[in-house]
Amino acid sequence: MDFGKNTPQRPGGLKQCFVSALLYCTGEMQQLHTHMQDKFFPLQLVEGCLRGISRVILLNNPLSGALILAALLLESPWQALLGMLGLLASTFTAIILGQDCEEVSSGLYGFNGMLVALLMGVFSSAGDWYLWLLLPVCLGGAATTFLSSSLAPVLDRWDLPVSVFPFNTVLLLYLVCTGTSNPFFPNHPAQPPGAPESTNHTQLHVPQLLQGVMLGVGQIFACGTVGPSLLILVAVFLFSPILAVYALLGSGISTIAGLSMSVQHSFLYSGLSGFNGALGCMVVGVFYILSWRTHLLSIANALLSAYTDIALSNLLGVLGLPASSWAATLTGTLVLLLTGKNLKEYRIPTGKPDPVCFGYLLITASPKLHLL
């Protein structure tokens, strides 16, 4: 009789095991983070670096970081090397300065260094495997940690994240200092998106435009091909399906904004018009609880980020400088400073777990899983 009673429970038990494994691998993977606290330093460093990679795109999941690293390797091994070197430089600088161990192990001091390194490689006109570039990559990565450490106490007063202010600042200073004719670190000049096309393109290719929406997510990591962009989108989905939708939604909105401003088709097709909108939309998804009000706010912020990016790109492009992610950074900060009571009640304090992560959605959908 006992055997007969236990038999019907097996499918339910397998389902619970599957959901438990899914919960362990998605969201912030807090159980793994707790488990790694007493492990050897190299293991903690690996986890912290993978989290730092995912922090670039507002995630906090080491598996997502591993997928993004695979995407970078697929896009360009040289770019992946530069990114990891910048990440390590900024992380070790934080350790040397004695920054909070929990913040270091969560990757909060790594992602700005990685972004600086990636964009130094993108704008370098010396080609791949130009080893002299490793020097500014290390120095730039370390500089982002100094800026992060300095800005954090100021921004904490308003419950604001440091975000990528250090990355944008260091990259801009580097490109202004080196210029396009530097004998050691020459760079490509950035082109304004509103500049005339080299040839007369009047017909819009819809398939390429739709592909550009996908590439807008990949361009957050300077990936301009479909395969790596898909891997990055999967990494976002692993952490939060809602954020993956927001990333595509923001990129699509930003692409439409680019069309309305007659942006060069090459910017639309390559995703360069979409990544600021994707980030702007995702910021709301990370720092606000999902509701119809915050959904409208995410759309509005994506539009604001897109038009701000076009304006800054046209302004800085005259000087041969990129606007990088200044637009999403500035508009995202303004959105987090909103004081209206109908939105303020949905605001998630900085540093709190993300309620749109995969694990949270599964738990709220199945209250019995709290017992697992």
What are these regions (language model features)?
Residues W132-L135, W158-P166, S270-F275, H295-I299, ...:
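Loop-to-transmembrane alpha-helix initiation sites
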Residues P166-V170, A247-S254, H295-A306, A328:
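Central hydrophobic cores of alpha-helical transmembrane segments
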Residues S106-Y109, G113-P193:
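Membrane-interface helix-loop-helix junctions at boundaries between adjacent transmembrane segments
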Residues M1-Q99, L215-A222, L231-F239, G332, ...:
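N-terminal signal-anchor module of multipass membrane proteins
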Residues S163-L238, I242-G252:
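Generic multipass alpha-helical transmembrane bundles of integral membrane proteins
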